[in-house]
Amino acid sequence: MTTIIAFIFVFGLIVFFHELGHFLFAKRAGIMVKDFSIGFGPKIFAYRKKETQYTIRLLPIGGYVRMAGEDGEEIELKPGYRVGLELTPEETVSKIIVNGKDQYVNAQPIEVSLCDLEKELFIEGYEDYDDTKKVRYQVERDALVIDGKIETMITPYDRSFNAKSLGNRAMTIFAGPLFNFILAILIFTALAFVQGGVPSTDNTLGNVLPDGAAAEAGLKKGDEVLSINGKETKSWTDIVQNVSENPGKTLDFKIERDGKTQDIDVKPATQKENGKDVGKIGVETPMDSSFTAKITNGFTQTWNWIVQIFTILGNMFTGGFSLDMLNGPVGIYTSTQQVVQYGFMTVLNWTAVLSINLGIVNLLPLPALDGGRLMFFLYELVRGKPIDPKKEGIIHFAGFALLMVLMILVTWNDIQRAFF
């Protein structure tokens, strides 16, 4: 049960931040957001505020922000349509009832002759279906079209995705992965404050364990290690490497303590790691507890992970691709099951790493991903005009289909690794 809760928390938080990025930048650009959904499948919770419906759905493995004009939907009232109009006191249209007119007793019946619900925002027709009573009404920018139980807000063209500048459209799409990186930065920064600092690369000693070789030799926390066996040590990595390579051998530590230099002999204990003898002296990594180190940790950790993930991706394509290199939801669930055993802080760290992964994967220039859409914007920038929407739609559909096939293969591979 703990794993399930952790899995929902991890995926939910990552997806929420990703979609929040799209949502906030869409709002900033003046784009109408029709749906903000976390998860897929049947609705568990739904809430409408103004033009946007917010939903939480059963399967917490994704989400979406549906922006006006993005999927090519269009409300069209052809000449001859008979509809009902609810009017404001100013004689402007607030509701257009296509079906279910009997539930709106005050609706004005009209047979449509001409209608524009995108640019000029008007509806023209014959009142009471009488061709001698031609009328024309302005339509409110937030007017609703009622089709039975379905209510759809009209989309003035200037509120649609495609009406916005190339820069605004690109930033709205890029904001999803960007917010994944922001989430990672926030988590890594918070962890640095909670844990009291961040691992330091200095050549000083951290906590000295009471029963270790360092304690027996007289080393103390804060000692600066100048050299080991005459070999200069400039960083914590140098200390670890020298100790690890000399199990059971006495080492001459030249240290500085309270401004004075002294030599201390230390004999590392021998431990097995991956079938190999390594030296250990019982000293923890030094911690930098300065405010600057804590506040910058989020940025440095996130950047280091981005570099590492891109390196892995590069190796995948240059060294041969295998499905075993990928994890789907089942694989991530299995990994989360292992991470949970180490406590909440480790789960948070895992969340940050996954968020960076999702951000990078979404930026890959593949159809149906944010990176694929950004490539189309680059094409538009170079060419001076966008690609035909129908052609772009076909490419995205094909890309989505291929991604679904890959997801099925990866999930099946995850199941085999987990249960067989």
Curated annotation (Swiss-Prot):
Organism placement in taxonomy: Bacteria, Bacillati, Bacillota, Bacilli, Bacillales
Transmembrane segments: 172-194, 304-326, 347-369, 393-412
PANTHER family membership: MEMBRANE METALLOPROTEASE ARASP2, CHLOROPLASTIC-RELATED, REGULATOR OF SIGMA-E PROTEASE RSEP
EC number, as in UniProt: 3.4.24.-
UniProt-listed InterPro entries: PDZ, PDZ_sf, Pept_M50_Zn, Peptidase_M50
Keyword Metal-binding: yes
Organism: Listeria monocytogenes serovar 1/2a (strain ATCC BAA-679 / EGD-e)
Cofactor: Zn(2+)
Gene Ontology terms for molecular function: metal ion binding; metalloendopeptidase activity
Protein name per its UniProtKB record: Putative zinc metalloprotease Lmo1318
